[in-house]
Amino acid sequence: MGRKVHPIGFRLGYIKDWQSKWFAERNYTELLHEDVMLRKIIAKELENAGVARIEIERSANKVEVTVYTAKPGIVIGKRGAKVDELRAELEKRTGKKVKLNIQEIHQPELEAQLVAESIAEQINKRVSYKRAMKQAVQRAMRLGAQGVKIKCSGRLAGAEMARVAWERDGRVPLHTLRADIDYAQVHAHTTYGRIGVKVWIYKGEVFPDQKGQTQLPQPAVAAARPGLTVEEEERPQRKGGRGGRGANAGAARGGRGGRSRS
């Protein structure tokens, strides 16, 4: 069976960037496990804050964590009390100085992670999955998305047999590397079992060399024979010419037949 490559991992280094930015030689595995631990702690503490993604950068003895959220007020807390508590917890678990940055997301309807979490939360509250998917697609397209695709799989509406439901609008070119596609996968835990929610959002094309400018395709140059231009080379042959050659060949064969009879 065919499998789809991860849209973000497929574009890393081209139009997408890594969410962990550091280099290590000997203690690579330790730092990798530390990154996983930091992400789990932040996701647990900020479960209801609408966290879309977490970026981690490292220096010698310092860790810089950037949290992109749709609800910065919940993350920061009253007079910054909650963010200070979170920073202290991260420093205690890592034993390093942690710098915590909070970035606000102004259009959460175009973030695949937040859209998937919203659909999963509605499914947990027994909202119709069809309605949740359709509303999410409509909101994303209304705010400028060029294409949206949502997939829900599992025992939908408590059915005896698991099935897959799709909702889509616009186009989502998965094989175009310059296509800016956001992707997320979330699970909804219901009394009937676990339901998977996948979201693809196509935001337009991004050109690595000239961002913000549309690059027109270069005209193709065909190889022509000496003495002929490209237009003459690509001009199709007339049907009459082929018919004429066929008639001449038939006449030649007929002439040979006449000589054999004599």
Swiss-Prot record:
In alphabetical order, the GO MF annotations are: mRNA binding; rRNA binding; structural constituent of ribosome
Q: Where is the KH type-2 domain?
A: 38-106
Q: Which SUPFAM superfamilies match?
A: Prokaryotic type KH domain (KH-domain type II), Ribosomal protein S3 C-terminal domain
Q: Which CDD domains match?
A: KH-II_30S_S3
Check the record and name the Pfam families matching this protein. Answer: KH_2, Ribosomal_S3_C
Q: Which PROSITE patterns match?
A: KH_TYPE_2, RIBOSOMAL_S3
Q: Which Gene3D superfamilies match?
A: 3.30.300.20, Ribosomal protein S3, C-terminal domain (3.30.1140.32)
Positions of the UniProt region annotated as Disordered = 211-262
Q: Which InterPro entries match?
A: KH_dom (IPR004087), KH_dom-like_a/b (IPR015946), KH_dom_type_2 (IPR004044), KH_sf_prok-type (IPR009019), Ribosomal_S3_C_sf (IPR036419), Ribosomal_uS3_bac-typ (IPR005704), Ribosomal_uS3_C (IPR001351), Ribosomal_uS3_CS (IPR018280)
GO CC term, one of those recorded: cytosolic small ribosomal subunit
Which terms under GO biological process does the entry name? translation
The family annotation for this protein states: Belongs to the universal ribosomal protein uS3 family.
Quote the protein name from its UniProt record: Small ribosomal subunit protein uS3
Which organism is the protein's source?
Roseiflexus sp. (strain RS-1)
What lineage does the source organism belong to? Bacteria, Bacillati, Chloroflexota, Chloroflexia, Chloroflexales
